[in-house]
Curated annotation (Swiss-Prot):
Family assignment from sequence similarity: Belongs to the PAPS reductase family. CysH subfamily.
Protein name: Phosphoadenosine 5'-phosphosulfate reductase
Intracellular or extracellular location(s): Cytoplasm
NCBIfam families given in the database record: cysH, PAPS_reductase, PRK02090.1
Pfam families recorded: PAPS_reduct (PF01507)
UniProt function note: Catalyzes the formation of sulfite from phosphoadenosine 5'-phosphosulfate (PAPS) using thioredoxin as an electron donor.
Annotated organism of origin: Pectobacterium carotovorum subsp. carotovorum (strain PC1)
Gene (name only): cysH
GO terms, molecular function: phosphoadenylyl-sulfate reductase (thioredoxin) activity
Residues at the catalytic site: C239
Enzymatic reactions: [thioredoxin]-disulfide + sulfite + adenosine 3',5'-bisphosphate + 2 H(+) = [thioredoxin]-dithiol + 3'-phosphoadenylyl sulfate
Pathway recorded for this protein: Sulfur metabolism; hydrogen sulfide biosynthesis; sulfite from sulfate: step 3/3
């Protein structure tokens, strides 16, 4: 199959983009995650990047993609408020998988932001969205631009939240191809992959965390809570990286 023409697809309205991608998405749904990655590397344009928050199940997509593209840049948007265990997990996975880690941060430090704006995460949905824009969306946009990305791999799964329930394997976001090879995996498949490949969950998994982000907007799971309710005080599920 010939390489997809990103410029031509970007020129189409979103509805027409979706229609153009619908047929290939139907085919991709029938492939294994490994086959999807192979297909993407053969048919989608480089340069390629892989984003990771180094969350609970991050080792899956990091291992899956780097098995076929060892030198792919791995983008981390570091807010400065990650758990100590997350930074330790980043170091451990970077060493274990020999990751080409590329860390991007906000142009203002965490302390400077607090001095200027206060604790944005305590200022309702609007404050959380501004915090995410400063610390996640802008650094990611900068990463995609500086790394000249044309195809962006990510480890999102439909099972993680209602907002991800209808996501396709292949889409266009921010002018680049967005590719989600494990979008249809359930928790059991994740567990089996980790076990078979000698990989670990995030250290906080054993302490009852289902999803891990910043220290101030992540809660330990309690009976009766959904995974979505453990992040951003239940006000939001997405941090903005995978929206729009």
């Amino acid at each position: 199959m010939a390489e997809f023409n990103l410029e031509a697809l970007n020129a189409l309205p979103k509805a027409e983009q979706a229609a153009a991608l619908a047929v290939v998405n139907g085919q991709l749904e029938q492939l294994s995650a490994q086959e999807r990655v192979s297909w993407a590397l053969e048919n989608l344009p480089g340069d390629y990047v892989l984003s990771s928050s180094f969350g609970i199940q991050a080792a899956v997509s990091l291992h899956l993609v780097t098995q076929q593209r060892p030198d792919i840049p791995v983008i981390l948007t570091d807010t400065g408020y990650l758990f100590p265990e997350t930074y330790q997990f980043i170091d451990a996975l970077t060493e274990q998988l020999k990751l080409n880690l590329q860390v991007y941060r906000a142009t203002e430090s965490a302390a400077w932001q607090e001095a200027r704006y206060g604790k944005l995460w305590e200022q309702g949905v609007e404050g959380i969205e501004r915090y995410n824009l400063l610390n996640k969306v802008e650094p990611m946009n900068r990463a995609l631009s500086e790394l000249k990305a044309k195809t962006w791999f990510a480890g999102l799964r439909r099972e993680q939240s209602g907002s991800r329930g209808d996501l396709p394997v292949l889409a266009i976001q921010r002018g680049v191809f967005k590719f989600l090879p494990i979008i249809d995996w359930d928790n059991r498949t994740v567990y089996q992959y980790l076990k078979e490949n000698g990989l670990s969950y995030h250290p906080l998994w054993d302490q009852g965390y289902l999803s891990v982000g910043d220290t101030h907007t992540t809660r330990k799971w309690e009976p009766g809570m959904s995974e979505e309710e453990t992040r951003f005080f239940g006000l939001k599920r997405e941090c903005g990286l995978h929206e729009g």
